[in-house]
Design a protein with these regions (language model features):
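Short, low-complexity disordered leader/linker segments with a strong preference
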Residues: 1-66, 87, 527-544
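Hinge/lid segment of periplasmic solute-binding proteins
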Residues: 44-54, 131-195, 211, 264-287, ...
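Extracytoplasmic/periplasmic substrate-binding proteins
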Residues: 76-83, 131, 138, 254, ...
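Periplasmic-binding protein-like
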Residues: 77, 424-450
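Extracytoplasmic "Venus flytrap"/periplasmic binding protein-like
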Residues: 84-172, 203-214, 350-351, 368-372, ...
Length: 544
């Protein structure tokens, strides 16, 4: 533990001087509905020697690593990685288990990590472990022994990258992982980032004499003008578009950041990793000022339990969201984003709010349109309020965060763990990451966004498109607003209330009143799983 804290402290010190002075999961789209398990080919690469002499495991013993992933996102690349790795290490089979969709994946995590974990995979989407087992708290997933802490692994040599594991990443990105995971552990290493942007059809906007929106007021006015011009759905949106509400919530709540940070005297306090929290006050002139602060989930839950969702703050936030959300299509929150994308590509909707993990597909689709159906298009960030409402900051920060969050399931089998870590290092090397991206794109699969591993770049056109998703990153305030905050049992109710609200069938007061029970049910489940006593100064024990 002392060594781990020393490593984290050194990392934090290297980052803070430059980054803080200079600046303050997800719902994914899947196209298959069945679950499949696939194994890569084990043929040897011509002219390559097996790497066995310096292996940290028993090369005379066969073993299997299982990589469990959600369909379509990097799956082609991951299969290629497995195939090439087995050419180097034929004693280790790598199985790529492809699960059909998000819900099936969460169910798999719950069943496979229950009890003795005999059927548990080895490398998983760590954020989905958090969603399934600890109500989005990845730090607690480490505490409970589900996920392996990679802190010490950062100092290990990566034989596939010519240096230490940490050398593949910027200090800033490693520190962000630490901050987002609760300030104590490294449950994953960064691979890529995702963001959200407004896609626009320039030809249709010009025809309707509408400027490209860049402010919140611009977006409101654009939707109003397009509606008047005859577009039934001026802005196409799918379930991921809830992030637009999160942007509005951040502009309001970030002034309260100091109230929900881990603080000196809290049981979780660690001076070496949380110094950014001390005496913190949000600086509106510096939108990056809070990026290395560490939120206290227990303080969040305490606030949520004491204040509920029917607050004046949330009324203001949802009132603002409604000014654009009322132009969303019917049933947007529960619909498949494929329809929203098709409406934009088919020029039914001039605007689309969408994530970078669909950007490559949209770019390819539009490039493939016949000449008589093609159109000029681009992406834009809605970066500010032109005239901020009372209580809101002027800068609108978007979602810009790590996308493919891959974690290792913890195990006491040292030989097996050494193999898992070695494959992970192979993947998170420059050559491995390039292979994963290139194979994925060549097979028509999605990539989530730009790669953060040093030395990995994409096709120039795709890089230029993805650059439009970069924004000052907002902190996550869904816990305060209730947006996407429901148990599985209550999710249909949440969808119904949200659709009634954005379609104008119920008022904001009625929406919040209806959501109060849904909100508290989720909070109570989160508190129970985490073992919180709602006193941050006392240590808690997460329930098994």
């Amino acid at each position: 533990m002392k060594k781990r804290r020393q490593l984290i402290s050194l990392l934090l010190a290297a980052v803070m001087a430059s980054a803080l002075i200079g600046g303050c999961g997800q719902k994914t789209q899947n196209t298959q509905n069945s679950q499949e398990t696939q194994e890569a080919d084990t043929g040897e690469a011509p002219g390559e020697e097996e790497k066995t002499s310096d292996a940290e495991w028993d090369t005379g013993k066969d073993d299997t690593i299982t990589l469990s992933v959600i369909n379509n996102f990097y799956t082609a690349g991951e299969k290629k990685l497995a195939e090439e790795y087995m050419k180097l290490h034929p004693e280790t089979k790598v199985v790529v288990d492809v699960v059909s969709d998000n819900d099936a994946y969460k169910a798999k995590m719950m069943t496979s990590l229950d009890g003795d974990r005999k059927n548990a995979p080895d490398i998983v989407h760590g954020n989905f472990v958090g969603m399934a087992l600890t109500n989005n708290n990845v730090g607690i997933a480490v505490e409970k022994g589900y996920l392996y802490d990679m802190t010490d692994m950062l100092e290990e040599e990566n034989p596939y990258n010519g240096g230490k594991v940490k050398d593949a990443f910027t200090d800033e990105d490693l520190q962000l992982v630490l901050s987002e995971a609760g300030g104590k552990y490294m449950p994953w290493l960064p691979f890529d980032k995702i963001g959200f942007a407004l896609f626009y059809n320039k030809d249709l906007l010009d025809e309707a004499k509408v400027d490209i929106p860049e402010t919140w007021e611009d977006l409101q006015e654009a939707c109003e003008k397009l509606k008047a011009a005859g577009y039934d759905v001026p802005i196409s949106a799918g379930p991921e578009s809830f992030r637009l509400c999160s942007t509005i919530a951040d502009a309001y709540y970030r002034g309260n950041t100091s109230d929900i940070l881990v603080q000196p005297g809290d049981a979780l306090w660690d001076e070496s990793t949380m110094s950014a929290n001390e005496d913190f006050e949000f600086d509106e002139s510096n939108p990056l000022c809070d990026q290395f602060t560490v939120f206290s989930v227990e303080r969040q839950m305490k606030y949520a339990s004491e204040n509920g969702i029917t607050t004046e703050a949330n009324k203001k936030i949802y009132d603002e969201f409604y000014t654009v959300g009322k132009y969303f299509p019917d049933n947007w929150i529960a619909a498949d984003s494929t329809q929203a994308i098709a409406d934009f590509e088919g020029q039914i909707s001039p605007l689309l709010y969408q994530a970078s993990f669909n950007a490559g597909m949209i770019m390819n689709d539009i490039n493939a349109l016949p000449e008589d159906m093609s159109f000029n298009w681009g992406t834009s960030q809605i970066g500010e309020f032109r005239d901020p409402p009372e209580g809101f900051g002027s800068t609108l920060r978007g979602y810009w965060d790590f996308g493919n969050i891959m974690s290792i399931i913890d195990t006491d089998d040292a030989d097996h763990l050494a193999r898992i870590k070695d494959f992970y290092k192979f993947w998170y090397s420059v050559d491995g990451a390039k292979m994963c991206f290139e194979e994925t794109l060549n097979n028509g699969n999605f990539v989530q966004g730009p790669c953060v591993i040093k030395g990995v770049t994409l096709d120039e056109e795709l890089e230029a498109l993805l650059a439009g998703f970069v924004s000052a990153p907002a902190k996550e305030w869904a816990w305060a607003t209730g947006m996407q905050w429901s148990t599985s049992a209550d999710t249909p109710k949440y969808y119904d209330y949200m659709n009634q609200f954005t379609s104008g069938k119920i008022t904001v007061d009625e929406y919040l009143e209806n959501m109060e029970t849904v909100y508290q049910n989720y909070n109570n489940e989160s508190i129970d799983r985490a073992g919180f006593d709602l006193d941050p100064t006392t240590a808690d024990q997460a329930k098994e």
